[in-house]
From Swiss-Prot:
This is Uncharacterized ABC transporter ATP-binding protein MJ0796. InterPro entries: AAA+_ATPase, ABC_transporter-like_ATP-bd, ABC_transporter-like_CS, ABC_transpr_LolD-like, MacB-like_ATP-bd, P-loop_NTPase. Keywords: ATP-binding, Nucleotide-binding, Transport. GO terms for cellular component: plasma membrane. Belongs to the ABC transporter superfamily. One of its GO terms (molecular function) is ATP binding. The keyword Zinc-finger does not apply.
């Protein structure tokens, strides 16, 4: 499902070469839940951006759903992001002027243009809000009328709109209190176990990381170690 092969990412600062990632190898199976941990500057976000086709490696190969993404052009990368990956961010990134329902409809508008009716869009968006466990009575609320946890549920529903096989979550509980954060992680776990989504979570919180089946620890751009928490194959 997701494969990084000898991936290196460098940036140039003056005459100095900075290694954000250094010869990283990673395999994530379809339907797996993997957490990525490490201190600030360890390369967590860079790795997630490369997996999410938001950035390209300096060296190495990246495969998403058996598609090598290195040589894809911008339009092809956009299609990969649109169809195969749902993004969940720490700060929710909802459009403040739109309702919860309209925020979830946006990916459907971009994908289907006029090929999906407004009624079909609304039905799918409501389905996604239900999957994200947000009560329908909040569908017409704007983000500033929702709690942080409710906003993150809307963001998860938006990530599900185009039914991608992969969910990438960058510090999904970072802006939430611990109780609400745990509920959000339980939701991601449910989407993984019941709907078969491949989930990759970047976090600095070990309690969040332990929702995964294994934890990849990064340090100075390299995979320092891996911890297996429970058996993916034995589910």
């Amino acid at each position: 499902m997701i494969k990084l092969k000898n991936v290196t990412k460098t940036y140039k600062m003056g005459e100095e070469i900075i290694y954000a990632l250094k010869n990283v190898n990673l395999n994530i199976k379809e339907g797996e839940f993997v957490s990525i941990m490490g201190p600030s500057g360890s390369g967590k976000s860079t790795m997630l951006n490369i997996i999410g086709c938001l950035d390209k490696p300096t060296e190495g190969e990246v495969y998403i759903d058996n598609i090598k993404t290195n040589d894809l052009d911008d339009d092809e990368l956009t299609k990969i992001r649109r169809d195969k990956i749902g993004f969940v961010f720490q700060q929710f990134n909802l459009i403040p002027l739109l309702t919860a329902l309209e925020n979830v409809e946006l990916p459907l508008i971009f994908k289907y243009r006029g090929a999906m009716s407004g009624e079909e869009r609304r039905k799918r968006a409501l389905e996604c809000l239900k999957m994200a466990e947000l009560e329908e009575r909040f569908a017409n609320h704007k983000p500033n009328q929702l709690s942080g946890g409710q906003q993150q549920r809307v963001a998860i529903a938006r990530a599900l709109a185009n039914n991608p096989p992969i969910i990438l979550a960058d510090e999904p509980t970072g802006a939430l209190d611990s109780k609400t954060g745990e509920k959000i992680m339980q939701l991601l776990k449910k989407l993984n176990e019941e709907d078969g989504k491949t989930v990759v979570v970047v976090t600095h919180d070990i309690n969040v990381a332990r929702f995964g089946e294994r934890i990849i620890y990064l340090k100075d751009g390299e995979v320092e170690r891996e911890e297996k928490l429970r058996g993916f194959d034995d589910r």
